[in-house]
Amino acid sequence: EMEKEGVLSIIKYPSNIRHSYWRYIVKLSEKIDRNLLRQKMLKKEIAIDWPYDPPLHLQPVFKNLYGTKEGMMKRSEQAMKRHVCLPIHLKITEENAMYIVSEFKKILKEKGDV
C-alpha cells in the first residue's frame, strides 16, 4: 500500500530479534523530497530525521584521514539520500505511534511535491 505513495521499504524484524527502539528507518523513493516531508511532519509536531547522512566514508574524519570522496561508494550515498527515521522510543504509546503513521501516510498521499 505504501509503495504507491513513495515508501519503498519498511524494515521488518524477525520474531527472534528485539528492536533497539533507537531508530525506525523508512526507505523512500527518489520522487519524495525528504526536506519537504520533514517540514510537513514538523507542522504536525512530528520530528523526523536522517542521522546516517552523510555516509561514514564522507564524514570529515574519514575524508581527512583516507581521502575518501563523493562517488566512491555510490550505493551507500544513494541509500543515505533516500531514508528517513520516524520517531520511536521505549515508552511510545500506541496512540502516539498510530498518530505518527497516520500523519505520515496522509502527507505522502497529499497532492503536490513531497
Feature names for model-found ranges:
Residues E1-V114:
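PLP-dependent aminotransferase class I/II
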